[in-house]
Each structure stands twice: as structure tokens, then as C-alpha cells.
């Protein structure tokens, strides 16, 4: 596949290696959900889901539409929607066997009624708020009674119960430990009340890496699938992860500018000497952070080149000083390795004032994804949601 502007390269082999590393670290018998929300953190939900299928018991998404896309492309294992779902989407969820989070009796009653009307059984996971203050029942006696009432509703099956750590990615695990204790006790109380809960899960990526004692029945692997650690406070010598995505562009034009020449919008960069600069075919319209303007660097022929002036929607300029061999058509690495140099998602996030999870998620739909494994291209190039030929 030929690319003439910008593309993201996703290494499915590295994703497999990351899954193996996590799987080997889990306690025996612990299952794993693969979190593929936001199009698998920008990596492509369908190719990623198919790649990790043998490692997981199911998938976690954030929206109904994300779950439906997986079903349309033949994903058969459990799909758990982690975010709240309105009653207007219940029929689609029932028809496509999508498990829903549940944290209010009235919501459960509406889902039960819809399931009875459709002649189907709805699967739910009880959401428990142990410290995130997002969604979920508080882990108290009153909530145990609510879960009992929900469990008695017709055409509804409790498939699991979960909570989410708010601070497991910090060096101090005190908060995560307290959340785990609350959740563990609530799970025990619910089961003691006669409610069957097949799967209890609380550990996110940070929990998988550093808190194996909190694994419970299942864990939810997210950012670690894609080769990134949740934060720089999470130890990186426990599980070896490899970044799965690179972002590459091209030099489309080279020119020489003289002293006093301004570069890009606002003239925020003005040349102090004669310079050779490159125009690169990528911009914030592709999801490349505009906040890298005048601060970020790219790799050309294994050397770092500074971004000059403001990043435009579709293009930006870079300094070719010290890279005399650069020519039009040459590859430009925005994220990834070139020779002995590497630019990571974490570096881009730090320089731009963002969050490293954001960087791959923001890479736009107009950026083709090239999938590779063991150095060879697999599947096909994808630029739009439904283009999954070859997978």
C-alpha cells in the first residue's frame, strides 16, 4: 500500500506480545477483558479485537455503537458496555447480546421489561462506586437490597459486578487498596444475600501491572494492550510492554529561507539566519497536537528536526539544519523509532501539555492505518470505520 501524506502503523505482533506478557502475569484462573473503546484507543477496534481474541473472555467498550460495530464484524465473545445506556438503545443491545452496566433499580426494570417484550434475556454487570464518583451503587447495605431486587427481575441475568480504580496509577497504592477492600466486601455481601455473581472485576491496566492480588475473577486491560504504561509512576520493569503504534508522514517540499523570514501563522518563528526547511504533510486536522507548535520535534533520517512556527490543520514546517541528506518524499516519523532515536506518545503528551492516552485516540479517521505483523503488512489499509477488508 502506497501512502503519500500521513499514516499510522499498527503492529499487531506487538499487541500480541503485550497480551502474552500480561496474561503470564495474572494469577491462575483470572480472566481478561480487552478494552477496545474509542476504536481501540485509535488503533482500530476490529483488527485489535481479532488479534487479542484468544487472550480474552470478552471485550469492553464505552458506547453501544462501539459494541455494534464489533458484532457487525463477527466478534462473538461477550461485549460489555461500560458507559450508561439510555432505554432507547435497549432493543439493539438485546438483539446483539451486549452486556450493560446497571446501577439503578428503575433502569434495570426498564431493561427487564424490554427483554420480556423481545423474548430475550438481558445480561448486566452491576456497577459499584467505591471511590471514582462516576457511575455505580455505593457499597452499602441499601445497595445489597437493590441488587437483590434487580436479580429478581424477569428476563435479566447478572453476569458480573465491577468497580473502577481512580488512583491505581499512583506510586502510593493506599487509595486503590481501600477501593479494593470496599468492593471485595460488597461482593461478599451480595453473594451472602443469595445473589449469584459469576465474575467480579476491578483491576484496570495499572492494577494488572502492580496489583496482582487484586485480580479477582477478571481484569480489564486497556492502555497496556497498546504498549503504554498508565503513568510514569507505574513500574515498568514488571511487565515488558512494546508501543504498538507509529505515526509517519512525508516531506512534501523543501525550501531555503533567509534571515527575517517568518514561518507559518502569526509569524511566531522568524529565521535569524539562512535556513533549509521542510514542509511536512500532517497537521492538527489529523490529530497531531497543535500545542507542539514551536516545541515538538520529528525524526528525519534518524535525526531530530524541530517544528518551526505553528502547526497548521494539514501541514507544518520543520528545520532541516544538520540533515543535508533530506529530500522531498522522505519519511518523517512523528511517533515511533527511526534509527537510534525514538519519539513516544508520552513525549508528545509532555511537550503539548496533554495526556498520553489522548494522543492515539485523537489521530483522525482520515489517517489511514497500516497493519503489520512480524515486519509484513497484513489485512489492508483502513481509513473509514467500515473498511475492514482483510481482517
Q: Predicted regions span which residues?
A:
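Short secondary-structure boundary/capping segments within folded domains
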Residues: 23-26, 269-271
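Active-site-proximal beta-alpha core segment in soluble small-molecule metabolic enzymes
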Residues: 2-10, 14-17, 24-201, 214
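Active-site anion/phosphate-binding pocket segments in diverse small-molecule metabolic enzymes
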Residues: 1-16, 31, 39, 66, ...
Amino acid at each position: 500500500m502506497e501512502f503519500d501524506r500521513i499514516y499510522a502503523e499498527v503492529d499487531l505482533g506487538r499487541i500480541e506480545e503485550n497480551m502474552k506478557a500480561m496474561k503470564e502475569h495474572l494469577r491462575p484462573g483470572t480472566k481478561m477483558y480487552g478494552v477496545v473503546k474509542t476504536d481501540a484507543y485509535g488503533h482500530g477496534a476490529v483488527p485489535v479485537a481479532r488479534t487479542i481474541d484468544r487472550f480474552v473472555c470478552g471485550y469492553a467498550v464505552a458506547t453501544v455503537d462501539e459494541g455494534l460495530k464489533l458484532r457487525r464484524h463477527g466478534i462473538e465473545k461477550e461485549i460489555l458496555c461500560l458507559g450508561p445506556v439510555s432505554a432507547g438503545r435497549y432493543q439493539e443491545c438485546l438483539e446483539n447480546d451486549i452486556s450493560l452496566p446497571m446501577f439503578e433499580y428503575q433502569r434495570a426494570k426498564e431493561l427487564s421489561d424490554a427483554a420480556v417484550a423481545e423474548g430475550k434475556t438481558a445480561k448486566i454487570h452491576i456497577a459499584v462506586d467505591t471511590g471514582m464518583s462516576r457511575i455505580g451503587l455505593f457499597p452499602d447495605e441499601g445497595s445489597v437490597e437493590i441488587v437483590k431486587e434487580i436479580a429478581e427481575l424477569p428476563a435479566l441475568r447478572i453476569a458480573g459486578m465491577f468497580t473502577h480504580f481512580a488512583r491505581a496509577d499512583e506510586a502510593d497504592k493506599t487509595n486503590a487498596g481501600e477501593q479494593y477492600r470496599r468492593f471485595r466486601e460488597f461482593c461478599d455481601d451480595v453473594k451472602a444475600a443469595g445473589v449469584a455473581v459469576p465474575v467480579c472485576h476491578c483491576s484496570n491496566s495499572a492494577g494488572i501491572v502492580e496489583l496482582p492480588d487484586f485480580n479477582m475473577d477478571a481484569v480489564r486491560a486497556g492502555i497496556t494492550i497498546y504498549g503504554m504504561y498508565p503513568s510514569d509512576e507505574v513500574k515498568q520493569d514488571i511487565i515488558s510492554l512494546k508501543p504498538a503504534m507509529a505515526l509517519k508522514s512525508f516531506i512534501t517540499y523543501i525550501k531555503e529561507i533567509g534571515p527575517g523570514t517568518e514561518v507559518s501563522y502569526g509569524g511566531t518563528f522568524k529565521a535569524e539566519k539562512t535556513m533549509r526547511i521542510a514542509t511536512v504533510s500532517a497537521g492538527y486536522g489529523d490529530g497531531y497536537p497543535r500545542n507542539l507548535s514551536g516545541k515538538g520535534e520529528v525524526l528525519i533520517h534518524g535525526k531530530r528536526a524541530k517544528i518551526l512556527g505553528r502547526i497548521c490543520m494539514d501541514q507544518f514546517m520543520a528545520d532541516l539544519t544538520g540533515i543535508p541528506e533530506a529530500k522531498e518524499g522522505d519519511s518523517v516519523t512523528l511517533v515511533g523509532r527511526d534509527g537510534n532515536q525514538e519519539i513516544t506518545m508520552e513525549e508528545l503528551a509532555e511537550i503539548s501539555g496533554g495526556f498520553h492516552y489522548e494522543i492515539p485516540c485523537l489521530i483522525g479517521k482520515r489517517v489511514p492505518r497500516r497493519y503489520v505483523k512480524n515486519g509484513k503488512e497484513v489485512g489492508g489499509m483502513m481509513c473509514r470505520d467500515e473498511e475492514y477488508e482483510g481482517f
